[in-house]
């Protein structure tokens, strides 16, 4: 046993000796043994300590002897008492915690001041070990009772973490383990006593004005739970320590930037138990508990008189409802004003009231105010301005997320400058204007817009004298879909000839629909306002409507609506219908049931599934993320699941999880085949669970790099690129196969050609270029290409398919002059080359035959039917009545083919169509002609017979 362990055990013997109310039968012997035999006392204390480590608070609360001892102490909440009873007999901390709670009941201000004094960092805290803190409480046991009640407040929760099991500490889950060094960077450990402490409830504003920064792993709360607890009670959470930070919330000093910055600025350190005590002390109900128990049943009705906060909150809804009844008596204007939606009622009246983006509003104001000076109604661009200059743009494009004030700013700026705004939004037809306008602008909105920008005609309700200046607002231009065919192109044409300014508004300026429109507009990108800016505006609206809500709750509302201030005002109005005092939890509950739908990319979905909080997502949320793109999300998960390391798992456990995830991905692929091939769409959710949800739930955690130089973010699915390359190679191989079959030099199938023939073809095409002289090598290679009907594209295909990773390029040693001579020689012989396949030349007036059909025709089968003796059948024996039906069609096709072949022969191109069945079909044509045309038929028959006979002879 190490020296620090001996010192720690002796400290607890001293603490047990100073506990006067301990009724345990083992506490006394431990103290006596410490005086007579130190070695035996250490062994006894160690046995008690190890026995205590195997117990938790939920099981240890069943000890009846300790419950009787605790009854001597004044009453406290039952759940809290079970948590404090979970400590060992040798630890006097539970009794001290109960005394501190009683002390808190006497005076509410003491815990705050005491925590600020006791939670300053010390050397023992800096060591990161809970044992040092435990020794501090033992040293204070010798002091008077007042000091004894103050110090254990800090060590109650810290001591439990410090005295955790040794295995837990080495694993990084105890208080002494911490988050480790660089190798554990980015890993957030689970709280060592998660769910074992009762979370207190205080007044809603007990933490108002306090700013907290959370660092490290807390004792029983997750970081998100601690943030919600602080915000629920009016506190503010920031990400870094500054001069405005009140407390650094951490249960151990793990070092790092936050801790060093806090020590440098003198920021006070606060533990989780200290935070609980601050919140618990603000609740005045505990102060009246002893009074009700002592004064009997007559005093039971008294507590409502001692809780003024409830009286105030109950009286405020009445005060809120009374003004609602007053406005009807004040006139019709008030009735109309109260019936308006808040988004219209509190719409900004001047540009300065717009939340955020003031610089863009000023830029829009300057552009619109100088528009007529720049273009002067001439319809042409200003002189002296470059095309890429902002002042040379006749239109402006406002882009940004919905609800951040784009349309409002356009209308307010136009109104302030004296322009009359003509708005055209997605509900209007914005297609291409008619070229011939007979009735002016009547009946067509697109025509009215066209004439408006030309100033050729005006609507009936448009008074030119009163409004000499006009601005056209084209809202939601990225929503021009199939119903507005040609709308974007017509809008660009209108901008070019426009005599009035045009303001275009969209949500996504990077949409493919607006790719050409952006070049003709001045882009102004609106950004989301900060949550502080939105909370300030929402607080103004809440006060005007008589609502009670704190700024922290409004900031949470602003953060949840993703910068959409219109949605935030609507949600605030909905909640005001049922409550006049809105709390932090009310906003969270409201937005949880009516969250705004948003489009997320597959990368964002994978990040959320594999993130630290991926295990906390509900099942419906995981399904929504996986089904956001059911084709791409599983591919991204399969590409990146190996890079994720689950928190708190060793290498063996991680390999087991990887194997289970791979098996689940394979099952998902099998289900996907059933869905795509057999249209079993009822299995889509099963495929989603197997291919996305299960792998992400097994491996969610931190992402690490497996190869040096790799970027630490999710890669795009590599299967898509490989599948595209495989499809391209398959098409090229099909072309090569058809050409080789047409040459009659080989009758191999496509697989045989790829496996057996392709290496030999590659050697015959490249070896002469490397070994023989230039002229001889070029001639040999070109002759070989002609014999197998290999084109220049086929030559490149053979080279591409012959490349393998780790092997050298076949054309590596060929000099550039030889390559140039080969290309030149091949092109020179192109005019006299005999083309043996139909798809290598396009005959005018004849459709190109499908490649698969040509390949089937070129298969090495018997050209014509034969009789029992092996001789070809006669012409009149081959066909039946069906041949007679096809005679007329074949005759016309044959005439066209002959004329086209003559034209090609005149150009010097010799075409030989030596396909399957060519001779027999020609014979049928000749027989049909011979019946009615005499000599001409005989001549044609002789020609066809000659061709057929030669073909048959070659086959024999």
UniProtKB/Swiss-Prot annotation:
One Gene Ontology MF term: ATP hydrolysis activity
Places the protein is found: Nucleus
Compositional bias (Low complexity): 916-925
Knockout mutant characteristics: The rfc1-1 EMS mutants show reduced plant growth and organ size, and early flowering. The rfc1-2 T-DNA mutants have normal vegetative growth, but have greatly reduced fertility due to a meiotic defect and produce short seed pods with very few seeds. The rfc1-3 T-DNA mutant is embryonic lethal when homozygous.
GO BP of this protein: DNA damage response; DNA repair; DNA replication; meiotic cell cycle; resolution of meiotic recombination intermediates
Biased composition (Acidic residues): 866-892
InterPro entries recorded: AAA+_ATPase (IPR003593), ATPase_AAA_core (IPR003959), BRCT_dom (IPR001357), BRCT_dom_sf (IPR036420), DNA_pol3_clamp-load_cplx_C (IPR008921), DNA_replication_fac_RFC1_C (IPR013725), P-loop_NTPase (IPR027417), RFC1 (IPR012178)
Keyword rRNA-binding recorded: no
Cellular component, GO annotation: DNA replication factor C complex; nucleus
Compositional bias annotation for Basic and acidic residues: 1-15, 50-74, 186-200, 288-298
Residues reported to bind ATP: 399-406
Compositionally biased region (Gly residues): 158-183
Pfam families, per database record: AAA, AAA_lid_RFC1, BRCT, RFC1
Residue ranges of every copy of the BRCT domain listed in the record: 202-292
Disordered: annotated segments: 1-206, 286-332, 858-956
Tissue: Expressed at high levels in flowers and siliques, and at lower levels in roots, stems and leaves.
Keyword annotations: ATP-binding, DNA damage, DNA recombination, DNA repair, DNA replication, DNA-binding, Meiosis, Nucleotide-binding, Nucleus
Family affiliation: Belongs to the activator 1 large subunit family.
Job of this protein: Plays a role as mediator of transcriptional gene silencing (TGS), DNA replication, DNA repair, hypersensitive response (HR) and telomere length regulation. Is required in meiosis for DNA double-strand break (DSB) repair during meiotic homologous recombination. May participate in the RAD51-mediated recombination intermediate repair process. Is important for lagging strand synthesis. Promotes meiotic recombination via a specific pathway for crossovers (COs) that involves the formation of double Holliday Junction (dHJ) intermediates.
Self-association state and partner proteins as the record states: Heterotetramer of subunits RFC2, RFC3, RFC4 and RFC5 that can form a complex with RFC1.
The protein's name in its UniProt record: Replication factor C subunit 1
